[in-house]
Amino acid sequence: MITIDNLHKSFDGVEVLKGASLEVRDGDVVALIGPSGEGKSVFLKHVSGLLKPDSGRIFFNGKDLCGLRRSELVALRSRFGFLFQNGALFDSMTVYDNVAFPLREKTRLSEKQIRERVLAELEQVGLAEAEDKYPAQLSGGMAKRAALARALIRAPEIMLFDEPTTGLDPIIVHSIHELIDSTHKRLGFSGILVSHEIPEVFAFVQKVAFLHEGVIRFVGTPKEIFETDDTVVRDFIRGSLPSEALRFREQVPFQLNVNEARGGVA
């Protein structure tokens, strides 16, 4: 379980996080949504240990990350996986070598064992034929799949996704979401997913958290966020939905088939 308690963070006198708190239960993926510039990526970097809060605490299975020595934090990060906006692949390495990199750097596996694991993971993400390609030779969707394979190669307990579908077309967005969903079901990790893809992400997450003005204003299921009486949350959701989804919401009760809400776009 991850517990984020009353995080505060300022940059150059500007307070970005103003007491943000969130709990992520084991096996749950939480979508972190909210207006642009509200600090969602900053929040995620605190959870990963890349930033330290001005005040507040972050617990992973009861252990306070903010109180760990550097060596302890590095060891704990090995249980985390990260998927960044740009994928962060090494341009000079093939897809195979990118995915193998964490195993070569952080384990004592033989090259034979590494090869078995890398090829198996590439198969899982649909890149079995792309092991010898370089990032410049990949489409946007393929690059995200390669980055996801690298993030998953050590079977992390926690996955952190920072807008993993930014810049992709709707069909590729849908395929990446399906891949995240299938890998979550396969590996059972807990996770936080920062996204502006509403309502698509609601189809496969267990909870939704709404970050607004530095605090987590709402936490609930995808169904509950559509039913909330909080006008700020409701207005944000309505402003994020396309017109066909709004008509859909007015006509039928909430359901998780977001493809229907999108008018059948897959």
Which residue ranges define each predicted feature?
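A short, surface-exposed alpha-helical micro-motif characterized by mixed small hydrophobic
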Residues: 201-203
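Helix-to-loop junction immediately C-terminal to a conserved catalytic motif
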Residues: 48
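Conserved ABC ATPase "signature" region
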Residues: 63-64, 111-129
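Conserved signature/switch motifs of ABC ATPase nucleotide-binding domains
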Residues: 133-136, 154
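Conserved ABC transporter NBD signature motif
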Residues: 56-64
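Catalytic Walker B motif of ABC-type/P-loop ATPase nucleotide-binding domains
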Residues: 159-162
